[in-house]
Amino acid sequence: MDIAIHHPWIRRPFFPFHSPSRLFDQFFGEHLLESDLFPASTSLSPFYFRPPSFLRAPSWIDTGLSEMRLEKDRFSVNLDVKHFSPEELKVKVLGDVIEVHGKHEERQDEHGFISREFHRKYRIPADVDPLTITSSLSSDGVLTVNGPRRQASGPERTIPITREEKPAVTAAPKK
């Protein structure tokens, strides 16, 4: 049995490209991809570079996952629901929570029979009025739920600083 021996100088922070395990190759919270079932790339070469995250597609595409964004002027949620028709989806607001529910009964696909159901809940930010929330379904099966954020109640203003002649902190009397 061969045992890989790594020199201590390779494990130092100056060499972040070398990882003795697959820990750094994992995308936590995401499902397994086909490439995860093949041997670890780090076992094939000690100088494996993990591709930067900006080269990967957003994690919610093709995974059934969602992406929640809070931008300067709006709040939005994108959710992959390509396996559901509009009639099989419900979006509702209960208090400060958006609930998305999807369900379809058993149907046949290329692998046999399948039924699906999911529930997702998203907290509405305090500066978004629940009455202004809308939803739409794109042709590629992405459900978008969004609402405008309230702007600050007035224009920005600079507050002048005044100088006082007395100290803010006075010494306590000695006993």
Swiss-Prot record:
Chief site of localization: cytoplasm
Gene3D superfamilies associated with the record: 2.60.40.790
Taxonomy of the source species: Eukaryota, Metazoa, Chordata, Craniata, Vertebrata
A cellular-component GO term for this protein: lysosome
PTM-bearing positions, type N6-acetyllysine: K92, K166
Pfam families documented for this protein: Crystallin, HSP20
GO terms of molecular function: metal ion binding; protein homodimerization activity; structural constituent of eye lens; unfolded protein binding
Span list, region Disordered: 142-175
CDD domains noted in UniProt: ACD_alphaB-crystallin_HspB5 (cd06498)
Record organism: Sus scrofa (Pig)
Carbohydrate-modified residues: S41, T170
Residues that hold Zn(2+) 1 according to the record: H83, H111, H119
InterPro entries the record matches: A-crystallin/Hsp20_dom (IPR002068), ACD_alphaB-crystallin (IPR037882), Alpha-crystallin/HSP_16 (IPR055269), Alpha-crystallin/sHSP_animal (IPR001436), Alpha-crystallin_N (IPR003090), HSP20-like_chaperone (IPR008978)
Post-translational modification Phosphoserine, affected residues: S19, S45, S59
Binding site for Zn(2+) 2: H104, E106
Keywords per UniProt: Acetylation, Chaperone, Cytoplasm, Eye lens protein, Glycoprotein, Lysosome, Metal-binding, Methylation, Nucleus, Phosphoprotein, Secreted, Zinc
Role summary: May contribute to the transparency and refractive index of the lens. Has chaperone-like activity, preventing aggregation of various proteins under a wide range of stress conditions. In lens epithelial cells, stabilizes the ATP6V1A protein, preventing its degradation by the proteasome.
In-chain residues carrying the UniProt-annotated modification N-acetylmethionine: M1
The protein's name in its UniProt record: Alpha-crystallin B chain
